[in-house]
């Protein structure tokens, strides 16, 4: 039986500057590349028309086409990782399995199970840093404790980067070390219960001009000055290392956004309870109203507040929402409507193409006040004030809520002044 190494693709669907793939291809044995559609993960994608599955499938097909240039192919499975690796162990003499580290709580548990299974069979399991520039224990306080405030974390992060310049891994130059695998078969998406969507996804190309104007225009939702790279960062079709170097050259503000991403991943690693509960436990005592009709109006963009409704309609139609508007709609749900942040977090998780557990959780807990380094509970965004400041000509609103000046437009779901006072009283009571 031929001895091989295996590379397990997950949130790293690219061949260039892929750390784990580089290590696998450098280890001296032919490499079998695999991707696993795990039913435990897919249960979080209940909509058969979820465009994220189309994105993943296209990425896998692209990888497969690249590998065929080297007389190999990507092996795609639909099963649990434990079952897949059990089968692969009967097909090959596996020396090692290589992959890139996933920092989410469920992924950590999964990888430990797989590592234990493989080691019981005498197979080594190697995981590498690829999703982030610095992993959870590299940017910490002098006493080794994690940061829970962004500004000192960011300062320390940049100091580390200056002291340890980024190293690239030229995995794309080693594809000749893939194992020869002749196969004309590549699975269709409908074989795992999903329908292919006719959708144009954002480019993964980095726009230098956009980044040069990012700082001054990023808060204006009508302007096309955001990178739209979130989906590529989520599924690893772009290298965080390359993107960081690019940001260093063109935009300090954009670099800070990448650091926020790293920060929230570190928070989730060190404080896994935040995935389901408030980072600050006292906030779990807030008595939410959780009115289902109000929630439905928020979801469908019928609150009577044009900026909120524009954001929700954009999300529902495109799977994207401008970051400034994300803050406004999240604040509105949690403070104007007094609906648990977890309801909004879950809705975003179903709708966002770029959904990332750490970033989504961190953003929602920031807006509700329950997170680390969050907006104070008494900061209640005024949708009208935000509109005047960031969409003064209503270009963004007119695109998504064309009826907003007509009699047919929904009446405000709640008065802003009343909602603000109610939120302050509710938060004060819950935080006693």
Where are the regions a protein language model picked out?
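Trp/Phe/Arg-rich N-terminal binding region typifying the photolyase-homology
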Residues: 1-161, 250, 313, 425-430
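Hydrophobic alpha-helical segments, especially transmembrane helices
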Residues: 11, 112, 262, 325-327, ...
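Residues within alpha-helical segments
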Residues: 25, 312, 345, 417-424
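A short alpha-helix capping/helix-coil boundary motif
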Residues: 40-44, 63-66, 92-95, 164-171, ...
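Glycine/tryptophan-enriched, flexible segments
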Residues: 123, 145-283, 386-432
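Active-site-proximal binding-pocket segments
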Residues: 225-398
